[in-house]
Amino acid sequence: MLCAQSLYANGFKIQEQSLNATALSSAYIAGARGADASYYNPANMGFENDWGENKSEFELATSLINIPGFNFDVATNNQVLYSKTTLQFNKNPVIDLGPLGKMDIEGLIKLGAGIFESLNDLFKPIILEHSTPDSQIVTGGTGDTALVVPKMFYKSRTMHGITFGGSFVASSGLAMQWAGKGGEFLQDVFIMMVEANPSVSYTINNRLSFGFGYRVMYAMGKFNNVVYVPLDKEGGGISLNQEQIINLAKHPEAVNALIPESIKNQIGPILNKLGTLSSSLIIPGCNTNGVECVNWGVLMGNVDGEKTNLFGTSKVYQKSEGKDLSTGFRLSASLRVFDNGMLSVVYNSPVKFDMAGKVEALTYVGGAMGNVLTTANLNIAVQMPEILALAYAQEVFDKRLRIEGVYERTFWSRGWKFNVTPDFENATYTGLSGLVALKDVFSSETLKQMVGIADFGVVSNMGAGWRDTNTFRLGLTYKSKNMRLMASTAYDAAPSPQDKVGIPDSDGYMVGAGAKFNLRGFDFGLAGSWTFKQSMSSLYHSGGLGGLFIYTASLGYRW
């Protein structure tokens, strides 16, 4: 696949928030100046901006995030689903055969087996196929995705070494609709994380500065997707007691749907041969091509118990949503090296979310069994990772050219990335069709037992196996009295495993460019950042390069 085009821009963080960061591929830490320093490096708010001023500043930026459409091929998780049912017959003589007296159902079957040997199959498990598997490779795709995201940045004038600032950004987000069998896993996804970040810095002698930012983040998400869940790995199965089976016998049309054709084709001829002796086992006035219709309800009434095991995977269509408010912090420090260099370090703490919400999961058992709707409370555990960045910027050619290099370590391996935990214990279970819709047979507790054999743990943690990553950024800024020109490149490693179905991604190679102009206290500009990804390193293949493109425009005012 085009690797979800960085689905969340390598993981689920989008670093390119301001115009400067977009143009510089986020190689903008030691060289951060002005209003957006409140977000990227609060310590630098205390230094003069690139126009040589100590002023209050406000900047409004708007980004267009574009993910080009793509098609892809991926291995499927959809296996065949079949059931194996074992019946325990009543030993009491409950069937009246007239002159032959009464006989239990097992005796009747053995009597018939003397004529039709294959009737012994009734003592064997009844095997029914509920679904067919997909081909090993399935195709998916999505159209172009475009998001418009506004952002704001502010810093005050520095007084007595103290500077205040703040920012409001969308630090993560995604809205995509995936089509086809291959796209079912992320069929309709919307994620939004917004961050308000008040900050303060203290600068000593225009040489050493410390900064602190308090991160207040709100996260929400809505997800409609399809997963294929393994069933009954422990072999526990589903059991009906005698009362439930007696109630099932009251629905002969439902029972009839459960009996394999091979057995139906043998019982009818036996009843024909028995004639009036089998009157209690036939439906009066009903025959097909001269063969009596069997009253399967009466037969099932003579079953003490049953056990059904399900094998393979069941299709589950999920609709879920969740939201949460959480906090973190940002620490930074900058040291001026001689007159033309700046060394900076920035630490972003992890921000943990427990997004509370609801989930509706429709489990497709299929066949005569039908489908079960589960409604439950839900918790989605997501952690924005901690990030440590080390940067150095050097100004040359009479401070007209700034060269900045950034090393960034993102600790993806710590904490949950996308762990979904439904409260199945206190959920509501409803049978929507087939046998499971018979409330006198399948109680809520039985439906709970049925859903309980599904191994949702296989698909509940889509961030499993993520690793810490390194990012390397290089930016160039040319400065004149009324203009700044910027260009950059970066390499951003993907945290997610490339050989698993989950949140897909692959390493990104970035380039950026932009310009900002100064006019009578105002500044305005345009910038672009282009991330390219090679799909062949991912489990999701499409060939060629994927892309994540960000275009940012800004307008600032200084006073």
Which role fits each region the language model picked out?
Residues 8-25, 98-129, 138, 147-559:
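Outer-membrane beta-barrel porins/channels
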Residues 13-28, 49-72:
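Transmembrane beta-strand segments of Gram-negative outer membrane beta-barrel proteins
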Residues 29-33, 66-145:
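Surface-exposed strand-loop-strand hairpins of Gram-negative outer-membrane beta-barrel proteins
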Residues 4-6:
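N-terminal signal peptide c-region/cleavage motif recognized by signal peptidases
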Residues 29-31, 42-51, 155-158, 173:
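Outer-membrane beta-barrel pore proteins
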